[in-house]
UniProtKB/Swiss-Prot annotation:
Residues 48-50, 60-64 are annotated as: Receptor binding. The keyword Disulfide bond applies. This is Stromal cell-derived factor 1. Monomer or homodimer; in equilibrium. Dimer formation is induced by non acidic pH and the presence of multivalent anions, and by binding to cxcr4 or heparin. One of its GO terms (biological process) is immune response.
C-alpha cells in the first residue's frame, strides 16, 4: 500500500472516531411536535417546562391516570396563568 494512501486512510479513520454518534436530525429535533389543548389541570400529575435554543417553549405533562407524557399547548389560558404565577414566585425569592 502506498504511504499516501495509508496516511489518508488513517486520517479518515481518526476523524470517524472523533465524531459524535448522533445524526444531526436527532440533535436539533424538538421534543414536542404536537400539542394537546383540551387537558384539564385535574388530570395532570406534574409539568416539565423545556426551553432550548432550537425550540419554542415546550411544556410536557405527565397524566395522573395512566402516567403518559403529553405536550401541552403553551398558549392555553390556564398554562399561561400557571407560568405567570411560577415566574412571579421565582422573582420574589431572588
Amino acid at each position: 500500500m502506498d504511504i499516501r494512501t495509508l496516511a489518508l486512510l488513517s486520517i479518515l479513520l481518526g476523524t470517524l472516531c472523533l465524531t459524535e454518534g448522533k445524526p444531526v436530525s436527532l440533535v436539533y429535533r424538538c421534543p414536542c411536535r404536537y400539542f394537546e389543548s383540551n387537558v384539564p389541570k385535574s388530570n395532570i400529575k406534574h409539568l416539565k417546562i423545556l426551553s432550548t435554543s432550537n425550540c419554542s417553549l415546550q411544556i410536557v405533562a405527565r397524566l395522573k391516570h395512566n402516567g403518559k407524557q403529553i405536550c401541552l399547548d403553551p398558549k392555553t389560558k390556564w398554562i399561561q396563568e400557571y407560568l405567570e404565577k411560577a415566574l412571579n414566585k421565582k422573582a420574589k425569592k431572588t
